[in-house]
From Swiss-Prot:
EC number: 5.1.3.25
BP GO annotations: O antigen biosynthetic process
Gene (UniProt): wbiB
Reactions listed under catalytic activity: dTDP-6-deoxy-beta-L-talose = dTDP-beta-L-rhamnose
Protein name: dTDP-L-rhamnose 4-epimerase
Keywords for this protein: Isomerase, Lipopolysaccharide biosynthesis, NAD
Role according to the record: Catalyzes the interconvertion of dTDP-6-deoxy-L-talose and dTDP-L-rhamnose. The equilibrium is strongly toward dTDP-L-rhamnose.
Positions of NAD(+) binding: 18-24, 68-69, 90-94, 191, 195
Matching Pfam families: Epimerase
Activity dependence on pH, as recorded: Optimum pH is 7.8-8.4.
Pathway: Bacterial outer membrane biogenesis; LPS O-antigen biosynthesis
Catalytic center residues: Y191
InterPro entries (UniProt xref): Epimerase_deHydtase, NAD(P)-bd_dom_sf
Length: 363
């Protein structure tokens, strides 16, 4: 449980889109009891929710409205009866690889779902005090890299020819951790492009309507509560399932792809910390652990936990995947009154305990 001051949410009417998912359930534990009314709007999509039933992890005081953010009629039905003061916009399609073949679905939910929200706010004359959007590190794409002479460049998306030749890195350059105030967003996936469009829509709308907006660009979130059946998101859970079955964990490229893995508890606490600040016209922060970890190292931690075989590099790749991703937390640490508490080893151990409990509960 977060120990930050959440007085700015006490007694407020809060709406959370996509609030029955992984992150939504975690923040409901921190916020639902503090709100005067806490409403979750979620379509319980089968890719995330194997059964279209209320998640056990969703706080009992959360009112669940099963509806799609792209449905204008659903927005009318909800907001004719409920005028939220705080809106946490989590609803999104999040599959990087899947977005290449289902681009329309990602654009519909991530972009049109956001404009349906803003249209409904205007239509019903709601004076929102604060909107918080969870965005993604995917908006940065490959991000900024530094040459040996100190020059900073943006190499852009790795092409198919480069990947087929197993030229994984950009020679003579080092990746720089992303930071919102200095790293240009240049997405290399359809998913990342739709998340950046989502940011742009809300920025333009919120500045015009003088609605305070906070955007959190999340790194790779993992931990108890994430889907164990969705193969498009959450490689930590996917690798855990394989290792638990004593199967070999396959690693793309050369295994040295890096990611910033951040615990769900740290992410939920960051959201609460952001809401606990006096809202500004626009705030933009990176949320991660601040540490880059190779996929190989992460897989080895999981395999060792179960006594599974050594992970194996298979040389496969996915178009649109970035080589390295990590964030610089200096601005977030200085402004949010928050810092990550969970090491990767501790977080992975906690996830394995939860997975065992979930499987026992379902058997």
């Amino acid at each position: 449980m977060s120990d930050v001051n959440a007085s700015l949410v006490d007694g407020k009417k809060i709406l959370v889109t996509g609030g029955a998912g992984f992150i939504g359930c975690a923040i409901s534990e921190r916020l639902a009891a503090r709100a005067s009314r806490y409403v979750v709007m979620d379509n319980l999509h089968p890719q995330i929710h194997a059964n279209a039933v209320r998640p056990v992890a969703l706080h009992e005081k959360a009112e669940l409205v099963v509806a799609d953010v792209t449905d204008a009629g659903a927005w009318d039905a909800l907001l004719s009866d409920f005028q939220p003061e705080i809106i946490i916009h989590l609803a999104a399609e999040t599959g990087t690889g899947q977005s290449l073949t289902e681009a329309s679905r990602h654009a519909l939910v991530n972009v049109v779902g956001t404009t349906r929200l803003t249209d409904a706010i205007v239509k019903h004359g709601i004076a929102v005090e604060h909107i918080l959007l969870t965005s993604s590190r995917a908006v940065y794409g490959e991000g900024a890299w530094q040459k040996a002479d100190g020059t900073i460049v943006y190499p852009g998306q790795r092409g198919r020819a480069q990947l087929e030749a197993a030229q994984w890195d950009f020679p003579g350059m080092t990746m720089l951790p992303s930071r919102a105030d200095r790293t240009e967003p240049r997405p290399t996936s359809v998913y990342g492009a739709t998340k950046l469009a989502q940011e742009h829509v809300l920025r333009a709308w919120s500045l015009a309507t003088k609605t305070p907006l906070s955007i959190l660009r999340l790194q790779n979130v993992y931990g108890p509560g994430q889907s164990l059946t969705n193969s498009y998101t959450g490689i930590v859970a996917l690798f855990s399932r394989l290792a638990r079955e004593k199967k070999v964990i396959p690693l793309y490229e050369d295994g040295n792809v890096t990611r910033d893995f951040v615990s769900i508890d740290d992410v939920a606490d960051a959201i609460v910390a952001t809401l606990a600040r006096e809202p500004e016209a626009l705030s933009l922060f990176d949320i991660g652990s601040g540490q880059a970890t190779s996929i190989l190292d992460m897989a080895r931690i999981i395999a060792a936990h179960y006594g599974a075989p050594e992970p194996q590099v298979n040389g496969a790749f996915r178009d649109g995947d970035v080589r390295h991703a990590a964030c610089d937390l200096s601005e977030s640490l200085a402004n949010l009154g928050w810092k990550p508490q969970w090491s990767l080893e501790r977080g992975i151990g906690e996830l394995q305990t939860w997975i065992a409990q979930e499987l026992d509960r379902k058997n």
